A protein has these predicted regions:
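Basic/polar, cationic surfaces and motifs that engage anionic cell-wall
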Residues: 1-21, 82-181
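N-terminal catalytic cores of peptidoglycan-degrading enzymes
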Residues: 1-71, 179
Length: 181
């Protein structure tokens, strides 16, 4: 399918993931630093502001350049948002005029739950991580140079609404979805 972007359902995603089982070890979560409705073929899946899942491939094992030195045997998923987001060294974040929506965050968690179930992966920080978490491991994230801080922090909604580590928010929701289908 190449760079053609197609809206898919979670059932269709299950089918794609089942075909990729045994060939994927990691899932990396991003935002695209773009506007809503703007999708990029660097990611296998893009999620729009209304939670719609957009696939840029019909083969989840296709190599995509989404995370520096971490693209082999990996799936990249991006929220279409945060075109003008700014992070500050003191931990404050301004998501700008195109913030991640509650629908996007929840949809990403559902996507992670489906993928992990079909791929046979545990939902944990070793198999599912944000770009910020991966970048910190490789010395270009929020802990060092702030080059990549995608999903570093996210509002915990519908929880207390406070900013919390984004990976924990999404993995926590994904575990909930996995246990409550």
């Amino acid at each position: 399918m190449g760079a053609v972007t197609k809206r898919i359902t979670l059932d269709e995603l299950r089918q794609l993931a089942a075909r990729a089982r045994g060939n994927i070890d990691k899932i990396y979560l991003h935002w695209s630093a773009s506007n809503y409705h703007q999708f990029f073929s660097d990611y296998h899946l893009n999620i729009d502001n209304d939670g719609a899942v957009m696939a840029t491939t019909d083969d989840l094992t296709e190599y995509k350049a989404h995370t520096w030195r971490r693209n082999s045997r990996a799936i990249g998923i991006a929220l279409a948002c945060c075109v003008d987001a700014v992070a500050y060294a003191d931990g404050r974040i301004d998501f700008g005029n195109v913030p991640p929506t509650e629908l996007q965050i929840d949809s990403m968690a559902k996507v992670v739950a489906v993928l992990c179930e079909e791929l046979g992966l545990d939902i944990n920080a070793d198999t599912v991580m944000t770009h910020a978490e991966a970048a910190d491991l490789d010395d270009y994230g929020p802990a060092t140079t702030f080059e990549r801080w995608d999903l570093w922090k996210l509002p915990d909604v519908p929880g207390d609404g406070e900013l919390k580590p984004g990976g924990q928010v999404i993995r926590g929701k994904a575990i909930w979805w996995h246990n409550n289908w």
